[in-house]
């Protein structure tokens, strides 16, 4: 792959794996783990009002969720009745929990049959969704979950499907199609078909073709749900073609960037001044965890190394590293073993790290969509956060203006001092 593709590629998608089995080691569905988290409390009514199974309610309590978010409040009652759902809501609003809870509520596990298929565009997101299924099905011991994606051996996936067939399959379209084509994965019993970050899969024509082929292998009668943070007017009709009279929920219009509690600033500087400024800011700002976004694999490696040399505990995640290494580092950061993550766009979409309260755009994102998904890493789950963008040339300034125009926000220059209470929870 050309370096330019590596730098700019948001999507982690191997088209060729449909034809050929990828090499490398595989992993079976990991054992269930208890992970803490908390969503923003918007509605006073609790999850109990949805009349969910007691096993689900117990898991929800264990996760520390008390009240459904706005999108959960809007979607879950209809989703658990089996309605088709098309939902757009900003990052950090708990969209994943909507389809995880709705499918687990309706699931009646049958040995040897896959009932739920969830697809997304990156391996990391697939891995994370499978973890969500594991934590919410904690008290449903009969429910089996497996995750399949490229970069790991397809033989291991075939083994899992043969010997320990899951009821819920999460994966990327390329690998799912490869498994369905070679008859390892039987889609004849699918009752729930879900696309997360659906626009990313349906905008790419090759990925859309894969999704369509997989869709045609599933029964006509099934529930279809699609979710994304950005759903353009052009892509909505494409989504509807997969659905029958869907309930459409657009929790906040794409013209508004209202990430509650997120302070956004920019810093004007030359490219060669970025490191010094970054170190100064990391020295003075209070943070739980920080994500720093860069535009290329080389810059990612170099900056992470530089931070470690300056005694900042940094870890890097980029497209150039093997899949196992990437997932292991993602888990290390999530488990709070490191407080600073340097990443390429690969990490920018859909990843939930609850302690992140500062996001840096060390390099300007290529468009306003990418800006939204990057800065949404900070201030998720209704917590406060800070986003700082470095602007080093006219093109950077143009993109920042696009962001302000599109989302109708005013991003001001970083002041000399920032009130700590504006971007960090004081009670922690």
Curated annotation (Swiss-Prot):
The record's subcellular location field reads: Nucleus; Nucleus speckle; Cytoplasm
Give TM regions: none
Annotated consequence of substituting residue 198 to A: No effect on ATPase activity
E.C. number: 3.6.4.13
Xref: InterPro entries = DEAD/DEAH_box_helicase_dom, Helicase_ATP-bd, Helicase_C-like, P-loop_NTPase, RNA_helicase_DEAD_Q_motif
Q: Which reaction does it catalyse?
A: ATP + H2O = ADP + phosphate + H(+)
Residue numbers spanned by region Disordered = 1-31
Sequence motif DECD box, location on chain: 196-199
Q: Which residues carry this modification: N-acetylalanine?
A: 2
Identify residues that carry N6-acetyllysine.
36
Q: Which GO terms describe its cellular component?
A: cytoplasm; nuclear speck; nucleoplasm; nucleus; spliceosomal complex; transcription export complex; U4 snRNP; U6 snRNP
Q: Where is this motif: Q motif?
A: 45-73
Protein's name in the database: Spliceosome RNA helicase DDX39B
Q: Which organism is it from?
A: Homo sapiens (Human)
Task: Give the encoding gene's name.
Answer: DDX39B
């Amino acid at each position: 792959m050309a370096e330019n593709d590596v730098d700019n590629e948001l999507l982690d998608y191997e088209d060729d794996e449909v034809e050929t089995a990828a090499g490398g080691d595989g992993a079976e569905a990991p054992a269930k783990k208890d992970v803490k988290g908390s969503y923003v409390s918007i509605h006073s009514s609790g999850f109990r009002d949805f009349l969910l199974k007691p096993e689900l309610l117990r898991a929800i309590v264990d996760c520390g969720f008390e009240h459904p978010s706005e999108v959960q409040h809007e979607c879950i009652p209809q989703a658990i009745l089996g309605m088709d759902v098309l939902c757009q809501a900003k990052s950090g609003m708990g969209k994943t929990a909507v389809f995880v809870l709705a499918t687990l509520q309706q699931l009646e596990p049958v040995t040897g049959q896959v009932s739920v298929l969830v697809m997304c565009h990156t391996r990391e997101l697939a891995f994370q969704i499978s973890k969500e299924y594991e934590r919410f099905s904690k008290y449903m011991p009969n429910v089996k979950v497996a995750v399949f994606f490229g970069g790991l051996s397809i033989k291991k996936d075939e083994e899992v499907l043969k010997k320990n067939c899951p009821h819920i399959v999460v994966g990327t379209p390329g690998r799912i199609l490869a498994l369905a084509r070679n008859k390892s994965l039987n889609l004849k019993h699918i009752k729930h078909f879900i696309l997360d970050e659906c626009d990313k899969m349906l905008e790419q024509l090759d990925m859309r073709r894969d999704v369509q082929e997989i869709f045609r292998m599933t029964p006509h009668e099934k529930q279809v749900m699609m979710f994304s943070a950005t759903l353009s007017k052009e892509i909505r009709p494409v989504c509807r073609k997969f659905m029958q009279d869907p309930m459409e929920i657009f929790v906040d219009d794409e013209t508004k960037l209202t990430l509650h509690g997120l302070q956004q600033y920019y810093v004007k500087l030359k490219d060669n001044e970025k490191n010094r400024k970054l170190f100064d800011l990391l020295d003075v700002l209070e943070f739980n965890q920080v994500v720093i976004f860069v535009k290329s694999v080389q810059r990612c490696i170099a900056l992470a190394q530089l931070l470690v040399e300056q005694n900042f505990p940094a870890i890097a995640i980029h497209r150039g590293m093997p899949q196992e290494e990437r997932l292991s580092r993602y888990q290390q950061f999530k488990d709070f073993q490191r407080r600073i993550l340097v990443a390429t766009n690969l990490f920018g979409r859909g990843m939930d790290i609850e302690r992140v309260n500062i996001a840096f755009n060390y390099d300007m994102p290529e468009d306003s969509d990418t800006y939204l998904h990057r800065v949404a890493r900070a201030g998720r789950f209704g917590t406060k956060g800070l986003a700082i963008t470095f602007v080093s040339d006219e093109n950077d300034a143009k993109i920042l203006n696009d962001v302000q125009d599109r989302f109708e926000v005013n991003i001001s220059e970083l002041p000399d001092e920032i009130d700590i209470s504006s971007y960090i929870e004081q009670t922690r």
